[in-house]
From Swiss-Prot:
Other noteworthy facts: CTPSs have evolved a hybrid strategy for distinguishing between UTP and CTP. The overlapping regions of the product feedback inhibitory and substrate sites recognize a common feature in both compounds, the triphosphate moiety. To differentiate isosteric substrate and product pyrimidine rings, an additional pocket far from the expected kinase/ligase catalytic site, specifically recognizes the cytosine and ribose portions of the product inhibitor.
Residue segments, region Amidoligase domain: 1-270
Positions with a binding annotation for L-glutamine: G356, L384, G385, M386, Q387, E407, R473
Function: Catalyzes the ATP-dependent amination of UTP to CTP with either L-glutamine or ammonia as the source of nitrogen. Regulates intracellular CTP levels through interactions with the four ribonucleotide triphosphates.
Protein name: CTP synthase
Annotated EC: 6.3.4.2
Length: 554
């Protein structure tokens, strides 16, 4: 029978509940347990697919095509289980499901209320999500409840968790509460009062934390932990200090050294061998002792909020791990390049244009791509980054000066990138779409297997086949592919049924390393295994840096 750990947050949001949950999961997995995770989001949106990155950060895409919270990316990077649609749900999905049942008459004429109908539905979703991994036989399911204690939006989720722990019985559920202990510079001390009030608020709704994770910018002294334990009505060893570190991959060791996994296993009556965190120790050692160093320029329009590119940033770090390289990322606002000032690109060892939507900043990205192509700087384009690479090549190499995407210019003479107008939905029905269709859930989503052309960089990186996740509405227009290929571009991977370009590259005679992919490889990169594409990209950046150094000496 699966046991549950509910992770809640207090005082403020963005304390790192997702990292804490993923780190605990990693420790429990290292003890030989099968672990899965769920994220419960209190917002009324059905999913984050149409939310602004400034509001929500990255949208993480699962293998089965769900647009989910970025915390699911942390989960997949920290544990071996693959997340699915059932591992993330929102208030919007809960209410949608309950209203559908009410319309079908499933409540037999009863008054539909938050308690019990909404809370029962939340519990049903939690139990369904816990069975999404490990063939439904997970030993532990860690359930992260979004928001903070005291938010009106989170109350039904907290109430559902309380009811569920009561229904499951003793030693079947535990609660971990993450809270803030701020340091007041003017007083020169840490203040525990916000944490005391947060735990008090949690206890008011019937939840007593099993363990308390206290976030601060420094380790919390024992006397402050003793004070917190007194007011929180819990043992002092269950008050765990979680201070700021330079890499999130130190967190599992930090929590293990303070006995969090022991406390949880004792509460849940789980008998498991000691944790083996040697892999995490090696990882941290490699991060702290790199043999090489490069700087990659990430050209985008959300560069002021790097959470928008969370999986991509981590994928580059993973590649650094597997090549003993410190990867520095310079975030470049694409709008600032539109005036033609490309001096900021001159010191870079490689250039990357990530995925995105909308016209704003695209001409600046195209200038960066042109610079990378003409100056033979290694280039990786992801999703929109590949589409813009095709547009840049069409304009400046293939002679189509007006080339563009219909996303940016419906009247373009050469629509080398165009809207996907027809595809199958998840039930196998063929759907027609237009620019006026709903935005939510109307993209090519999820993993897809694609054959790779032999003798290409793509085949050197991936072998015979690519299996990556997608999230896009627009595709390279097949009508223009012959003209692009005639000018030198190589389409190195195509979808088997529609024959749509999935990867493009330039031959070695034109550029040492210039690759674009329509999919999102960052979603499948992990610190354990890295990712072959990002590893090849970092190696290309190292080679470019070495060539530049040799030219400087000559």
């Amino acid at each position: 029978m699966t046991k549950f750990v509910f992770v809640t947050g207090g005082v403020v949001s963005s304390l790192g509940k997702g990292i804490a949950a993923a780190s605990l999961a990693a420790i429990l997995e290292s003890r030989g347990l099968k672990v899965t995770l769920l994220k419960l989001d209190p917002y009324i949106n059905v999913d984050p697919g149409t939310m602004s990155p400034f509001q929500h950060g990255e949208v993480f895409v699962t293998e089965d095509g769900a647009e989910t919270d970025l915390d699911l990316g942390h989960y997949e990077r920290f544990v071996s289980a693959k997340m699915r649609k059932a591992n993330n749900f929102t208030t919007g999905q809960i209410y949608e499901s309950v209203i559908r049942k009410e319309r079908r008459g499933e409540y037999l004429g009863k008054t539909v209320q938050v308690i019990p109908h909404i809370t029962n539905e939340i519990q049903a979703f939690i139990e369904r999500g816990a069975k999404a991994s490990h063939d439904g036989k997970a030993d532990v399911a860690i359930v992260e409840i979004g928001g903070t204690v005291g938010d009106i939006e989170s109350l039904p989720f907290l109430e559902a968790a309380r009811q569920m722990s009561l229904r499951l019985g003793r030693n079947q559920a535990a609660f971990v509460h993450l809270t803030l202990v701020p340091f007041i510079a003017s007083a020169g001390e840490l203040k525990t009062k916000p944490t005391q009030h947060s735990v008090q608020k949690l206890r008011e709704i019937g939840v007593q934390p099993t363990a308390l994770l206290c976030r601060a910018d420094r380790p919390i002294p024992d006397d402050e932990r003793a004070k917190i334990s007194l007011f929180a009505n819990m043992p002092q060893d269950a008050v765990i200090s979680v201070w700021d570190v330079d890499t999130i991959y130190k967190i599992p060791q930090m929590l293990n050294e303070q006995g969090l996994d022991r406390i949880i296993c004792e509460e849940l009556r789980i008998d498991a061998p000691p944790a083996d965190l040697s892999m995490w120790s090696r990882m941290v050692h490699t991060l702290e002792n790199p043999q090489h160093e490069i700087t990659i320029g990430m050209v985008g329009k959300y560069v002021d909020l790097t959470e928008s590119y969370k999986s991509l940033i981590e994928a580059l770090r993973h590649a650094g791990l597997h090549t003993s390289t410190r990867v520095n990322i310079e975030y470049i606002d694409s709008e600032e390049l539109e005036s033609g000032h490309t001096q900021v690109l001159e010191s870079l060892d490689a250039i990357l244009v990530p995925g995105g939507f909308g016209k704003r900043g695209t001409e600046g990205k195209i200038r960066a791509i042109q610079y990378a192509r003409e100056k033979t700087v290694p280039y990786l384009g992801i999703c929109l980054g590949m589409q813009l690479a095709v547009i840049e090549f069409a304009r400046h190499v293939a002679g189509m000066q007006d080339a563009n995407s219909t996303e940016f210019n419906l009247e373009t003479e050469h629509p080398v990138v165009a809207l996907i107008t027809e595809w199958q939905d998840r039930d196998g029905r063929v759907e027609k779409r237009s620019a006026d269709s709903d935005l939510g859930g109307t993209m090519r989503l999820g993993a897809q297997r694609v054959p790779v052309q032999t003798g290409t960089k793509a085949s050197q990186i991936y072998g015979a086949e690519v299996n990556e996740r997608h999230r896009h509405r627009y595709e390279v227009n097949n009508h223009y592919v012959p003209q692009l290929e005639k000018s030198g571009m190589i389409i190195s991977a195509r979808t088997p049924s529609e024959n749509l370009p999935e990867m493009m590259e330039l031959p070695g005679a034109m550029h040492p390393w210039f690759v674009g992919v329509q999919f999102h490889p960052e979603f499948t990169s992990t610190p354990r295994d890295g990712h072959p594409l990002f590893k090849a990209y970092v190696e290309a950046a190292l080679a470019h840096r070495q060539r530049q150094a040799q030219r400087a000496v000559a």
